[in-house]
């Protein structure tokens, strides 16, 4: 109960600070030429489903279905809710399109202007998941959470920065770097290789079965 109260306090602070930003947009008459995007990276479990925090499978709705509010002064639409499937990778493409900047060919996100203007359907399935854990797909009605066939099979980190993310953060150790290979198959690196580094799964990833939910 104490931690829930602390989290509620954090949300209240975020709400107040967001309100201050919106008040400034009112004060300086900025709505007519300012795009506003409010988004976050993940939700947070507060004991729902018997779980806590975020980075472990399954990615329930409380973690995966994140808020996204967009004001586009070019359309002026407000108070509209859309069921179009969008992802955070769409935001950079949306910003580039807004400023009439060419979207790089290797960028896999889809600009959201069509969604904002007339609820355009831009994808049939949205993908999300956790490194070394479940790979999930949803069409908005169902979500399929595919677990690895072999939880003990080797996994690799693909990067140009030899840093470990999540769990024990910091530089990847010398012994791990001895096993690196160059990997050329990433579509978003402009034909440049990245390091393929053997790594370990995080204990928090768990070993859950493949699941299917009707949302």
Regions inferred by a protein language model and the residue ranges of each:
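Polar, surface-exposed loop/tail segments
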Residues: 32-34, 79-139
């Amino acid at each position: 109960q104490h931690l829930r109260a602390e989290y509620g306090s954090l949300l209240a602070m975020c709400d107040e600070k967001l309100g201050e930003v919106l008040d400034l947009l009112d004060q300086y008459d900025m709505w007519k030429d300012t795009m506003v995007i409010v988004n976050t990276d993940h939700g947070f479990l507060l004991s729902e489903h018997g779980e806590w925090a975020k980075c472990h499978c399954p990615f329930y709705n409380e973690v995966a279905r994140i808020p996204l509010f967009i004001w586009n002064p070019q359309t002026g639409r407000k108070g509209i809710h859309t069921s179009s499937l969008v992802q955070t990778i769409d935001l950079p493409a949306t910003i580039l399109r807004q400023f009439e900047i060419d979207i790089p060919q290797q960028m896999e996100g889809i600009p959201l202007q069509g969604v904002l203007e007339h609820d355009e359907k831009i994808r049939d399935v949205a993908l999300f998941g956790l490194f070394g854990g479940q790979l999930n797909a949803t069409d908005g009605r169902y979500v399929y959470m595919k677990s690895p066939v072999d939880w003990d099979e080797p996994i690799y980190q693909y990067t140009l920065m030899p840093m470990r993310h999540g769990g024990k953060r910091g530089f990847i150790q010398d012994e791990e770097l001895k096993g690196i290979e160059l990997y050329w198959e990433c579509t978003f690196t402009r034909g440049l290789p990245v390091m393929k580094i053997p790594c370990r799964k995080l204990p928090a990833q768990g070993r859950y079965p493949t699941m299917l939910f009707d949302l």
